[in-house]
Amino acid sequence: MNLEIMQNSLVNFAFGGLLIAMLVYWISLAFPGIGGLNRLATLITLLVNIALTLTLSSRWFANGYFPLSNLYESLLFLAWGLTFVHLFIENKTKSRLIGATAIPVAMFVTAFASLALPLEMQKASPLVPALKSNWLMMHVSIMMLSYAILILGSLLSILFLIITKGKDINLKGSSIGTGSYKVKNTDAKSTLIFSSQVGIVQEQSNMLINSTRMNLLESIDNLSYRTIGLGFPLLTIGIIAGAVWANEAWGSYWSWDPKETWALITWLIFAAYLHSRITKSWQGKKPAILASLGFLVVWICYLGVNFLGKGLHSYGWLA
């Protein structure tokens, strides 16, 4: 079989598998009583990750360099990173939420790579001299992996904001959660305060609070924090590696290239998020808003700047 045909078949399989996995994850959340759905979705995601691994490995073998030299390859690597990180976190937390949020993004990325990009952008081309460096694999792979992790963490924060829309819910305690929360219905003046640590419930009205939902919100907030905490050090290492590579290739650590500027903005936003969690002990909506802003900025840094056709990192599609 022709190598290019095999790669296209694997990418098509990945897209179809992600579509099915997304539906299965959503059904498992809607009908938690149905057994085996989560395992099925996890198995499908694992097969998709293997398919993407084979695709990237075959391009590496065929072209002789790590497959991160163009937009098509970086999108496939991002989809691989999203599925890999999702499988890792799901294995650690046993939570279906990460799959229900990660898989749709991975599916969109795969579809965009295979359906939206022109064929000439999907083909590998010889590397320019500056890219013939081991820094290509280190810098770009770490940056893309950090993007994948930060996107997942930010998505969980967006999910938190969606669920809490219309309610003033403030989680109380340390930044990693203590089982305490305060809820205020924005449509009424009544307030209920609950603390699992002291076992006190004070009710000022007949408003009923679903404790299961509150525990879910705390889990989402917690998981978002831990995920972003994992991605931020990788982003930092990736930026430093890029600066060292830039000095080696062009004689300057930092040139305020649009990509570099937006990478710095991304770093500052997530640094502010972690600062608010660690030093201010923020939980709930305030840090979730910061993380949601970070979600937008990551995509601007990754795709928006590249499509402008300016700077060393540009793919020039819209130029």
UniProtKB/Swiss-Prot annotation:
Q: Which GO terms describe its biological process?
A: cytochrome complex assembly
Q: What is this protein called?
A: Cytochrome c biogenesis protein CcsA
How it assembles, according to the record, is: May interact with Ccs1.
What gene is this protein a product of?
Answer: ccsA
| Family membership noted in the UniProt record | Belongs to the CcmF/CycK/Ccl1/NrfE/CcsA family.
The protein's UniProt keywords, in alphabetical order, are:
Chloroplast, Cytochrome c-type biogenesis, Membrane, Plastid, Thylakoid, Transmembrane, Transmembrane helix
Thylakoid among keywords: yes
Please give the function described in this protein's UniProt entry.
Required during biogenesis of c-type cytochromes (cytochrome c6 and cytochrome f) at the step of heme attachment.
Chain ranges passing through the membrane: 14-34, 36-56, 69-89, 97-117, 142-162, 227-247, 254-274, 288-308
| GO molecular-function terms, A-Z | heme binding
Q: Name one GO cellular component term.
A: chloroplast thylakoid membrane
Q: How does it sit in the membrane?
A: Multi-pass membrane protein
HAMAP family on file: CytC_CcsA
Instruction: List localization entries.
Output: Plastid, Chloroplast thylakoid membrane
